[in-house]
Amino acid sequence: MKQRKTKRKKTINQKVKNATPNIYDGIEFKSKLETYVYKQLKAHNLKAEYEPIKFELIPAFAFCGKKIRAMTYTPDFVGDNFIIEAKGKPNDVWPYKWKWFMWYLLNKGLAEKYKLFVVHNHKETDECIRRIQEL
């Protein structure tokens, strides 16, 4: 009897699911939502960079002679006083990294500098843009 191969469902650290990459203004976005956020920021003359900096949340270290990689987080959009994360469908690691990122900002004295926004759709993006304009 022939054995059937079954696909194992990936559960650990899944990357972007069901996202459609886009290129707009020469920038390669990972999803349509990120492209929409960028277009809205640009339409409202709000200055923000796309994935400009990678924050090292936990530095690399050695454990029992084995190198452990640093844990990093790259926000989607960073402006002078705001950070926007466009999250269509969160993966399994997202909630932890977001908490560590907030902790990082707090401990580096940056929590007062940045207002954090997480958007999941166009409606939330539009509301986010409105709130940023009020800052």
Residue spans for each PLM region:
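Electrostatic, structured charged patches in enzyme active sites and in nucleic-acid/phosphate-binding
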Residues: 1-135
